[in-house]
């Protein structure tokens, strides 16, 4: 059986990167929540 995690930097950045988050209203909400929690890393 193929493993579910197939690492790919491009996919990672495109789906979970900072610019991807900033591009939608809900993505910005995610970043806001992470800032409130004090996360060291806001996005991938």
From Swiss-Prot:
InterPro entries: Ribosomal_bL34, Ribosomal_bL34_CS
Superkingdom, natural source: Bacteria
Keyword set, alphabetical order: Ribonucleoprotein, Ribosomal protein
A GO cellular component annotation in the UniProt record: ribosome
Pfam families (alphabetical): Ribosomal_L34 (PF00468)
GO molecular function, one term: structural constituent of ribosome
GO biological process per UniProt: translation
Region listing for Disordered, in residue ranges: 1-44
Bias (Basic residues): 1-16, 26-44
Signal peptide: none
UniProt family annotation: Belongs to the bacterial ribosomal protein bL34 family.
UniProt-listed HAMAP family: Ribosomal_bL34 (MF_00391)
PANTHER family, A to Z: LARGE RIBOSOMAL SUBUNIT PROTEIN BL34M, MITOCHONDRIAL RIBOSOMAL PROTEIN 34 FAMILY MEMBER
Protein name: Large ribosomal subunit protein bL34
């Amino acid at each position: 059986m193929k493993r579910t995690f197939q690492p790919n930097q491009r996919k990672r950045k495109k789906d979970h990167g900072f610019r991807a988050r900033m591009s939608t209203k809900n993505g910005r909400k995610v970043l806001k929540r992470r800032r409130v929690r004090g996360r060291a890393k806001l996005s991938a």
